């Protein structure tokens, strides 16, 4: 199977438990507080357009997701850039084209909303994720540098 029986659709508030479960399987850690904030922003804020997607099997089981944001901007005018901040594919379904299908649908959805650029942050030591984004035509930004300060 190369993602062929997988349907990509907009994320719904009812997907919370499945998304948190997939993330926990991927990271071997639970982050419900992170997803509480993400879902709050996604489904209750009027400042962001729906952009997050899920990958769903024919039986309704979620096997992956991608979350991003498109800020509406001042006076309801959307920005030409969006962010991709979280992506996850259930480890039992990896290497089947689901991540690529999610990224492609995410890109097409944003393109239809007038987005010209997608930004994301990746740990430079995460070679798997770096390879995934590189193979999906993401490249290091020429204009933005992530700065940090240890405290």
Q: What is each PLM-predicted segment?
A:
Residues 50, 142-146:
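Short hydrophobic/aromatic beta-strand or adjacent loop that forms the aromatic wall/cage
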Residues 89, 95-108, 135:
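Conserved acetyl-CoA-binding loop-helix of GNAT-fold acetyltransferases
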Residues 71-73, 92, 125:
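Short coil/turn motifs at secondary-structure junctions
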Residues 110-122:
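Conserved GNAT acetyl-CoA-binding A-motif
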Residues 10-14, 21, 25-79, 85, ...:
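Acetyl-CoA-dependent GNAT
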Residues 11, 87-89, 122:
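Hydrophobic adenine-recognition pocket in adenosine-nucleotide-binding enzymes
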Residues 100, 112, 124-142:
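Conserved active-site alpha-helix within GNAT-family acetyltransferase domains
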């Amino acid at each position: 199977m190369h993602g062929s029986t997988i349907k990509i659709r907009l994320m719904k508030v009812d997907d919370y438990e499945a998304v948190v479960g997939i993330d926990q399987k991927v990271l071997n850690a639970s982050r419900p507080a992170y997803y509480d904030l993400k879902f709050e922003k996604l489904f209750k804020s009027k400042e962001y357009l729906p952009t997050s997607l899920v990958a769903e099997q024919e039986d309704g089981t979620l096997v992956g997701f991608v979350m991003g944001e498109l800020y509406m901007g001042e006076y309801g005018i959307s920005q030409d850039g969006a962010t991709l901040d979280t992506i996850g594919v259930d480890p039992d379904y990896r290497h089947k084209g689901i991540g690529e299908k999610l990224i492609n649908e995410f890109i097409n959805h944003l393109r239809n909303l007038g987005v010209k650029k997608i930004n994301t942050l990746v740990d430079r030591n995460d070679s798997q994720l770096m390879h995934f984004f590189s193979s999906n035509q993401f490249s290091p930004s020429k204009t933005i540098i992530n700065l940090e300060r240890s405290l």
